[in-house]
């Protein structure tokens, strides 16, 4: 089993993911983020509306939505980083559009796995940094888009 597959198997185990989040991303753990799917192509993360994620307007606080959107792209990046030589990853940009009040369970999907893998391959081959614009779209239980986040990741192979 390659390193990316081993990483995917670990984080898709609910208990191991909770331990990872408790240790490395405690706010994500407190907010109740869950990884529903992780493939080389896409990741799906959910965040519930609850006491710890609410804002004064009876919807999910925008920073909690950003955390879920970032995890959907970041967990893919972590998986692809595991697949080869060491590389660093960093968020260098974030934009968001909000189109509807976020209540209930919000599901973020980020389909940018192939672009992340390509940027990492190029960085490992050239030693130069590469950026990827990942789009993480959040939908509510009715399937309506509530937010679209554009997260710019920078990848650089370590020497």
Question: What is the role of each PLM region?
Answer:
Residues 1-30, 52:
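Alpha-helical membrane-targeting segments
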Residues 63-83:
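Active-site helix/loop of acyl-thioester processing domains in fatty-acid/polyketide metabolism
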Residues 1-12, 102-103, 113-159:
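HotDog/MaoC-like acyl-thioester-processing domains
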Residues 76-115:
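Hydrophobic beta-strand-centered segment that forms part of the acyl-chain substrate-binding groove
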């Amino acid at each position: 089993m390659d390193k990316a597959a081993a990483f995917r198997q670990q984080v898709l185990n609910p208990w191991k993911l909770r331990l990872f989040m408790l240790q490395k991303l405690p706010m994500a753990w407190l907010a109740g983020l869950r990884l529903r799917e992780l493939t080389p192509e896409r990741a799906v993360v959910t965040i519930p509306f609850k006491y710890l994620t609410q804002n004064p307007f009876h919807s999910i606080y925008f920073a909690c939505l950003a955390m879920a959107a970032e995890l959907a792209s970041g967990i893919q990046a972590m998986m692809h980083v595991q697949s080869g030589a060491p590389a660093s990853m960093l968020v260098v940009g974030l934009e968001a559009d909000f189109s509807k009040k976020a209540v209930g369970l919000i599901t973020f999907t980020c389909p940018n796995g192939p672009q992340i893998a390509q940027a990492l391959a190029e960085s490992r081959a050239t030693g130069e940094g590469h950026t990827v614009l990942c789009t993480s779209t959040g939908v509510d239980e009715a399937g309506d888009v509530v937010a679209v986040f554009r997260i710019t990741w920078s990848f650089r192979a370590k020497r």
